[in-house]
Amino acid sequence: LKGNIEDLANHYHALYQEESLADERPENYDEALYWYDEYLESFPEDVETPGIHYQLADLLLENEDFGGAARAYESTAYEYAAHGQAAAAGYAAIYAHREHQKVAVGAQTAMVRSDAVTSTLRFIEAFPTHEHADVVLGAAVDDLYDMDEFELAIENGRKLIADYPRTTPEIRRSAWVVVAHASFDTAAYVDAEDAYMRVLEMTDADDETRQAVVDNLAASIYKQGEQANVMEDYRAAADHFLRIHAVAPGSEIRPAAEYDAGAALMRLEDWTMAAQVLDDFRRTFPDHELNRDATRQIATVYREDGQLARAAAEYE
């Protein structure tokens, strides 16, 4: 009986694939589907059942039932005792999900993407040494960030970096980018700074994205300065703001950071350092919109420091 059912499933599957019988494809598809299902229901524990389940998944994929194929491949990969086709089935499930993404529309799009990510993470856990594990995990990490799943994006981005040291530079850099962005978005600015530094190290000098990386690196440091200001730790705030000069001198936020460093030093009543920082700002960025404010601040610093003549000169 088992052999007869298998023969019938294979027979109708072959007829379905026959180009000369294109007009009969729907009927042959239904027949093949019926007999595959009959086999799975009749012999769920048989040693050959995973292979039959794999063939059913192939049939569904050939008929572009991508969601059904993905589920069938997942069942083949994860619902049986260990077998030789398990890893291939798990990988095929991810492929089917990705094909489904290409044709999904409307609200279905987000669900299909989520299914692809879930399938990928399951695959990585079950088959971490698969030859394409790093590639599919990299795609899932990108998706997790796009889905605003920041903590999972960080966790799996770091997993990719740590567990797959031989992955391509492109995949490694992309993982660090996700870790950096997601850390920034979750206010983990120290981690973001470290990750952006890693990205910068992997970015060529003539890469058109380099300036954005520099700006993001500077922003992660600037945010640490803002946090220190909120905590009224003005010395730490000034130090963070001034670090941008050394770490990201070409960043867009550097002028504002140096001005804010002067303001933090004024709160500390460190008049000498405040005057130096603000004067450096004024000379380095003579056309900046905060230049006039810097002059007023310098005058205030001199006045508070008892240097009235210098204060008066600044007011002039």
Residue ranges with predicted function:
Residues 1-316:
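Acidic, polar-rich low-complexity tracts and alpha-helical solenoid repeat scaffolds
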